[in-house]
Amino acid sequence: MEKKKEEDHHHQQQQQQQKEIKNTETKIEQEQEQEQKQEISQASSSSNMANLVTSSDHHPLELAGNLSSIFDTSSLPFPYSYFEDHSSNNPNSFLDLLRQDHQFASSSNSSSFSFDAFPLPNNNNNTSFFTDLPLPQAESSEVVNTTPTSPNSTSVSSSSNEAANDNNSGKEVTVKDQEEGDQQQEQKGTKPQLKAKKKNQKKAREARFAFLTKSDIDNLDDGYRWRKYGQKAVKNSPYPRSYYRCTTVGCGVKKRVERSSDDPSIVMTTYEGQHTHPFPMTPRGHIGMLTSPILDHGATTASSSSFSIPQPRYLLTQHHQPYNMYNNNSLSMINRRSSDGTFVNPGPSSSFPGFGYDMSQASTSTSSSIRDHGLLQDILPSQIRSDTINTQTNEENKK
């Protein structure tokens, strides 16, 4: 079965090939017939031209030297001069017209009889009526084609174009690589510069002032307004550390408050920076400002519910040493509570004017109520001052 199929397939292929051969032969025959017809039409056109020349010997034609007059006369089936001759009584002109009409009818097989009067060029001749224009040269920077067009020349020009394109692409790749390398170098150069700027932009830490105060309240009211912005656990201590910031616009003072793990009654308050604004004239809440000289064992009178503003001072007696000293710039202060509920409050120092105000010592005489108390009389109302003075005088009298 397979052999039969193969044989059938071969027969079909042979038949197709034979058909193709026949078609090509018929095409060739048709082309030859067309060429013969063209030769016949050319011969008839040449005979027509000869007849026109002979007719012009008996009857002169008005032939112009330019091509436009020739085409005008040839476009008409009968030249204009023949109509003029027909109006005359010449018998030969009528016969010539009939002869020319017969010749024009015989040449009607051609495409246009207006151009049949002119001899067509022979295909056998190598010369042509139109001159061949030179083909455009291949655009390349390396190879210039001056030879006539041929299959070999086209292959050379195409290879030269490909070589030029390869060179251009290679140059573009190298330029791109160089640009990428430059960009990477610029980025590497800018990164360390940015890091250096960031390091230099860090602000220097301002001086810190630490105070130790015995109090049950963590956030002591010192007259300024504070805003809590964070809290952090302290290592090896059950008490957290709170962070506060001054609420006045443009003031960067910070405060840290934490309770001591060794003595829970002590509150450590650390101030960082200095206030850039005046002290508030009306502090919040009731603030008891208790000042008195340090007596024999540091007992000064105060109510158990009130507390004092931290006022740093270096001049402390041997009986009242500071609990801790933090930085070189920091100042230590102790408010110690006695057995009867009183506080020990050292006086102010000129080295830290932002947290304390100077007060003169209260005397036992009655003139103490008339004595000038400095800035305190502008801040505290008169009732608070009179109450503190009265309590001091009463306790001194008891002693």
UniProtKB/Swiss-Prot annotation:
A GO CC annotation given for this chain: nucleus
Recorded superkingdom: Eukaryota
Pfam families noted in UniProt: WRKY
SMART domains for the chain: WRKY
GO MF annotation, one: DNA binding
Any one GO biological process: defense response to bacterium
InterPro entries in the record: WRKY_dom, WRKY_dom_sf, WRKY_plant
Record's compositionally biased regions (Low complexity): 143-161, 184-193
Ranges of biased composition (kind: Basic and acidic residues): 1-11, 19-38
UniProt main location, coarse: nucleus
Record flagged with keyword Nucleus: yes
Cystine pairings recorded for this chain: none
Biased composition (Polar residues): 162-171, 383-399
Protein's name in the database: Probable WRKY transcription factor 48
